[in-house]
């Protein structure tokens, strides 16, 4: 589910795995409201959230990374986060979080899984997926190549070809989209790999315009002429100046966890960035590691309240299978685990990898 959310589509795991789980629960006699199905359905959403911030070249991650570059440029010292290093940190944090949360569920929450003994593996084969057609194979191969063109410039920045790719990444994205709209390997329907009309109808325009508006607003609010950066620096510098670097990181992560589950995660990410930039730039601290962690954590931990993220809203909207009290109980537990892990694993790993 995490990898699917990262590289296929952020909502795909929930739309795919929840119906599969419903069928399995019905087949083996698990009732609504039992502990095991409640935890499993929430875990699918948690894994989806952990995969959501992974790709630095799309979605809210791209919006926040680009916004921070604009903020720091307005402050006189542009900070560009390395895409490959960011991706590595996000993947490691996601895998570790899933492993620890699953172990926590197994040995601490201990739901009754005895009915799983009645599961017939053949049931899962009743509706097999059809083989990939030419368009789907082309999409799979070309998408891997596209991801590499986005990440390799961060890994090999001194090569001239990589410098060319880095400067022209928007052109590459447009060219790749145009290629998908023109190529057709479908021998039956003769549709292009990317049917542009259908994609336009299904595109998340609301999220797109929200990201666009947030980036523009963030650049305006952090411009030197507004005085907001100077104000934040004046207010927060006395608070953070007495802290060690690690304690500064921990304080920011705790504040982020609280805010992202009250407000929208993207908005909170935008609000935290001027604070980080103001303090780090004035103190001579490399802000790339903590900024990367904040971006990953603010998007991944937004699970407790419906306003935190669309994924949290989907959890709370599943009234048929999930009760509000159970949702708050388990998501708060998982959020605390994620906080502990981002401090214990994320901080040292990001500090070592992101320069």
What spans do the regions from the language model cover?
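Alpha-helical transmembrane segments and their membrane-interface exit regions
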Residues: 21-27, 177-182, 301-302
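Hydrophobic transmembrane alpha-helices of multi-pass small-molecule transporters
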Residues: 85-234, 333-339, 343-355
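Hydrophobic transmembrane alpha-helices that form the pore/transport pathway of multi-pass ion
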Residues: 1-53, 57-75, 265-297
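Alpha-helical transmembrane segments
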Residues: 27-39, 111-128, 187-196, 309-327
